[in-house]
């Protein structure tokens, strides 16, 4: 009987010891919970950023390709669309070689260095200087999509007037000389506009109003002014070939712009939601504003006016999308559409 009691006591003692060893203390459980939450947040941020990158790429092809392709004459549709398509390939190669490094490497004022050339040290580890919850490779590919669409925007200014080979040379040089330094100055660590007066006067460009739209807009204006009108215009009518293509392209641009603006929050956060809402409201108000102005001026609205207004609103709300609430966003969009 005594042996049985001894065995039972030993068994109970061992069980209690094992339970004590397997049950972590509250601090250990809290640490494990925090790690689990951080891992889930990082996974969610990464998923949203990859989705946003795909949405921004869709803005170039097929969005911008269809939008511009529908506005030119029938004989130039494929050539115009091919310009957007080829830039998806050319800019990607340049970005991998030196583009990302010149835009986001180092901390100089005007242009980056070659620390990330050939995508060296760009892997799954986050870069805390830019996005601490997603792999640097995700951030790199997201910024690549911005670099692709920016020169593609300029192509509309010289549609039907520039040879394909000349377009390739121009956009390559433009990317290296204009876009990459501007991206570094506005978004790069230590960039001139990003850290003006020691950061006391920061550059509030949430999603690319300066880097993308001002650079491409000014460059497009200079190109159009330098190259002049299309041969025969305006004596020969040059109406859009297919507004159906342009309509589909504009709709794809509208959807893709959610990745453009809300993705610039660099995570699945409340800021991304705010930018998403501001983007949509701004575009809607701009479309209505343009249509109303056109209706008043011409006596009737048009499809081209509606899609042009929506795109104008999307452009106008881009730099402010992360800073304004829905009704100010609508006001910005309305002004863009009417003006």
Spans of model-derived segments:
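Hydrophobic alpha-helical transmembrane bundles of multi-pass membrane proteins
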Residues: 2-6, 10-13, 18-339
């Amino acid at each position: 009987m005594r042996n049985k009691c001894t065995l039972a006591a030993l068994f109970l003692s061992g069980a209690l010891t094992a339970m004590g060893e397997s049950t972590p203390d509250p601090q250990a459980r809290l640490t494990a919970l925090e790690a689990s939450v951080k891992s889930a947040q990082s996974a969610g941020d990464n998923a949203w950023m990859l989705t946003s990158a795909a949405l921004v790429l869709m803005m170039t092809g097929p969005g911008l390709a269809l939008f511009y392709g529908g506005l030119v004459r029938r004989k130039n549709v494929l050539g115009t669309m091919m310009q957007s398509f080829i830039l998806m390939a050319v800019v990607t190669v340049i970005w991998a070689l030196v583009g990302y490094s010149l835009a986001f490497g180092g901390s100089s004022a005007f242009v980056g260095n070659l620390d990330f050339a050939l995508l060296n040290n760009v892997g799954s580890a986050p870069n805390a200087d830019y996005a601490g919850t997603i792999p640097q490779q995700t951030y790199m590919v997201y910024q690549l999509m911005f670099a692709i669409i920016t020169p593609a925007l300029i192509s509309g200014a010289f549609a039907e007037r520039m040879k394909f080979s000349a377009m390739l040379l121009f956009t390559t040089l433009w990317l290296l000389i204009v876009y990459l330094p501007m991206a570094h100055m506005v978004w790069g660590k230590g960039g001139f506009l990003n850290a003006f007066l020691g950061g006391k006067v920061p550059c509030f460009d949430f999603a690319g109003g300066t880097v993308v739209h001002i650079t491409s807009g000014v460059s497009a204006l200079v190109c159009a002014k330098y190259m002049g009108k299309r041969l025969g215009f305006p004596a020969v009518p040059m109406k859009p070939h297919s507004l159906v293509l342009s309509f589909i392209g504009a709709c794809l641009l509208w959807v893709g712009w959610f990745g453009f603006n809300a993705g610039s929050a660099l995570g699945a956060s409340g800021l991304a939601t705010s930018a998403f809402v501001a983007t949509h409201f701004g575009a809607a108000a701009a479309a209505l504003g343009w249509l109303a102005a056109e209706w008043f001026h011409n006596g009737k609205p048009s499809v081209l006016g509606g899609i042009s207004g929506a795109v104008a609103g999307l452009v106008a709300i881009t730099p402010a999308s992360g800073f304004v609430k829905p009704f100010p966003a609508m006001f910005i969009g309305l002004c863009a559409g009417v003006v």
